[in-house]
Amino acid sequence: MDHYPIFLNLHGRHCVVIGGNETAARKGEDLLDSGAIITLIAPDLGGDCEDLLQRYPDRAHHRAEDYKPGMEQGAALVLSASGHDATDRLVYRQCTRLGIPVNTVDRPEYCSYITPAVVDRSPLQVAITSGGAAPVLARQVRSQIETLLPTAYGRLAALAGRLRERVAAVLPTGRQRLRFWEQVFDGPAAESMLAGREREAEQAMLELLRREQARRDERGEVYLVGAGPGDPDLLTFRALRLMQRADVVLYDHLAAPGLLRLVRKDAERIPVGKRRGQHTLPQEAINDKLIELAAAGKRVLRLKGGDPFIFGRGGEEIEGLIEHGIPFQVVPAVTAAQGAAAYAGIPLTHRDHAQSCRFLTGHRRHGALELGQWAPFRSDETLVVYMGLTHLETVSAQLQAGGLPPDQPAAAVDQATTPAQRVITAPLAELPERVRTARLQGPALIVVGATVTLQPQLGWYHSSPNAEPAFPEHGCLRGEPRPTRHPAPADTEQA
């Protein structure tokens, strides 16, 4: 973050506004609305500033002279809207020397703080800022948020504030209170408030509080959530909602690290590994951990790359939950195969090239790779091999032994759907050498089939040659140094 967001309590505190123009009036009114006492410093005032003095006679004052050093003494903050560079620079230097927060309108170089665009549903407030880089964009974002937040949210927040101490007295643990408030804001109480029935909303809150007080079952729940192939924009709404609700998150290295920033800030985060052939926790230990945490009353998010039921061991994990009577939800996702194929421009099916598609795994429970058991492989189908990067030579050989010709089109899609995505295409027999030369970062999917020939014309996603790895913990091929990204003429490399 370029700036640390903070809300100041200015009730009864003195603030200085330098300038007597329309901008000074607008900024001064914002301060007055926040409960501040202001002094406008300018030889003359425009009509808007005069209006402020009349409407706020006890809290808005005028000092009819040009700014001089020392006039800012004792101010909680200073806002300069003089419109004169020399004055603005002098104000900034003086305030900086004295440690007084100062903002200069449209001059970010003369600011020690910035004023955001605000959506006001007091006591609920949303602040949006571009850090001074694009104020118009910040205002447009504010306009969009304005349409999403009903004005009744302010009354709902005020009602919650009035009941907060009562709730704290009845529900002693933070987890109980969190569960209660989530049900309030996502249930009948909120709906009643939005419909204008405030009395009914309060009754619904009190009834829910009585039920929660009587509740003795502190058993938690497990959310088995697919994180998708890597791009956070491909998350489902339900996945995002549960990520914000979880008390603890168990995640593997196939879930892009950027996704963890979308998890509730105070949620405990537990890495459980899972990169090629290496596991921070064995699968059995992960299963036991889910049961242990849920039995302790926690809402547990199991965040898995791709879809939990496609080579994600989701079935193994929920078997133990069922055995122990732990409630759970499964949230599907855009699969790694779907995401990689779509972003690489490789259709999985096509009327002219592939009438079927099969998903295979390059990783077996007991280590042995035996793709031949799924033979014969046909040239008019698309094969997607998960976790095949490490053993790509074996994958290539077994697919050829199963019926595919050496020149069958094939591709490796690395870090799919992220800015670091790379696509390597080559005949099946040559793909392992091409991938080794490219030193892919992983994770990667292998796509084999005639539809790969369409990639040059259908590839639409342009990754960044200098992008940082999207999965920095995933590592390189065994025994190889970590690659350094260098600019390339294109994000697709072909043999």
Curated annotation (Swiss-Prot):
Phosphoserine modifications at: 130
GO biological process, one term: methylation
Organism this protein belongs to: Halorhodospira halophila (strain DSM 244 / SL1) (Ectothiorhodospira halophila (strain DSM 244 / SL1))
NCBIfam families tied to this protein: cobA_cysG_Cterm (TIGR01469), cysG_Nterm (TIGR01470), PRK06136.1 (NF004790), PRK10637.1 (NF007922)
Keyword hit for NAD: yes
Family per record: In the N-terminal section; belongs to the precorrin-2 dehydrogenase / sirohydrochlorin ferrochelatase family. In the C-terminal section; belongs to the precorrin methyltransferase family.
Record region (Precorrin-2 dehydrogenase /sirohydrochlorin ferrochelatase): 1-205
Enzyme Commission numbers on file: 2.1.1.107, 1.3.1.76, 4.99.1.4
Function recorded in the entry: Then it catalyzes the NAD-dependent ring dehydrogenation of precorrin-2 to yield sirohydrochlorin. Finally, it catalyzes the ferrochelation of sirohydrochlorin to yield siroheme.
InterPro entries linked to this entry: 4pyrrol_Mease, 4pyrrol_Methylase_sf, 4pyrrole_Mease_sub1, 4pyrrole_Mease_sub2, CobA/CysG_C, NAD(P)-bd_dom_sf, Siro_Cobalamin_biosynth, Sirohaem_synt_dimer_dom_sf
Active-site residues annotated for this sequence: 252, 274
Pathway named in the protein's UniProt entry: Cofactor biosynthesis; adenosylcobalamin biosynthesis; precorrin-2 from uroporphyrinogen III: step 1/1; Cofactor biosynthesis; adenosylcobalamin biosynthesis; sirohydrochlorin from precorrin-2: step 1/1; Porphyrin-containing compound metabolism; siroheme biosynthesis; precorrin-2 from uroporphyrinogen III: step 1/1; Porphyrin-containing compound metabolism; siroheme biosynthesis; siroheme from sirohydrochlorin: step 1/1
Gene3D superfamilies registered for this protein in UniProt: Cobalt-precorrin-4 Transmethylase, Domain 1, Methyltransferase, Cobalt-precorrin-4 Transmethylase, Domain 2, NAD(P)-binding Rossmann-like Domain, Sirohaem synthase, dimerisation domain, Siroheme synthase, domain 2
Keyword line: Cobalamin biosynthesis, Lyase, Methyltransferase, Multifunctional enzyme, NAD, Oxidoreductase, Phosphoprotein, Porphyrin biosynthesis, S-adenosyl-L-methionine, Transferase
Region (Uroporphyrinogen-III C-methyltransferase): 220-495
Tree of life domain: Bacteria
Region (Disordered): 471-495
Residues reported to bind NAD(+): 22-23, 43-44
Protein name listed in UniProt: Siroheme synthase 2
Catalytic activity field: uroporphyrinogen III + 2 S-adenosyl-L-methionine = precorrin-2 + 2 S-adenosyl-L-homocysteine + H(+); precorrin-2 + NAD(+) = sirohydrochlorin + NADH + 2 H(+); siroheme + 2 H(+) = sirohydrochlorin + Fe(2+)
